[in-house]
């Protein structure tokens, strides 16, 4: 079985997996941390420039842009909020992978959760899936990968994809 298939099957089964309460607790803490980084980061130049680049697409959609609360498409909200959450470098870190998982994972999950009206538990399960997949990938890629690439950007894609696939019910 390929690694991609194994991670896909893991995400597909995430809704049925028994998750201990302390894992949900850590997913909630990661989400709070994400908001604490994203709201002030949204006031900084990188997020403002990203917003300006997409301003023609703002106003239609169900996904929220922080900190002001405008609505847009899930793609735009994930990009703008992801930029904001990583701007101040106060976002969470997975030290073993030299990686900030919250920025890509929670930005994608929140954008899709807004647009798809998912439960809080479904949201948290998506966050857990994204962290699990991306942290495992980051663990095997560093430190050599970090010599040339920013792990949050390269590995974050996998976490955001895993979490998004769970939110959307993809396999």
Name what the model sees in each region.
Residues 1-171:
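N-terminal core-entry segment
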């Amino acid at each position: 079985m390929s690694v991609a298939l194994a991670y896909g099957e893991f995400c597909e089964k995430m809704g049925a997996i028994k998750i201990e309460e302390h894992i949900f607790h850590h997913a909630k803490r990661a989400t709070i941390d994400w908001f604490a980084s994203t709201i002030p980061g949204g006031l900084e130049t990188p997020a403002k420039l990203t917003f300006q680049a997409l301003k023609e697409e703002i106003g239609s959609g169900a996904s929220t842009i922080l900190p002001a609360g405008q609505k847009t498409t899930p793609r735009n909200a994930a990009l703008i909020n992801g930029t904001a959450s990583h701007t101040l470098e106060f976002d969470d870190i997975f030290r073993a992978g030299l990686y900030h998982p919250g920025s890509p994972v929670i930005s994608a999950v929140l954008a899709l959760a807004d647009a798809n009206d998912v439960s809080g538990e479904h949201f948290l399960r998506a966050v857990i899936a994204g962290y699990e997949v991306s942290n495992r990938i980051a663990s095997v890629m560093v430190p050599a990968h970090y010599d040339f690439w920013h792990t949050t950007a390269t590995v974050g894609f996998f976490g955001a994809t895993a979490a998004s696939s769970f939110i959307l019910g993809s396999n």
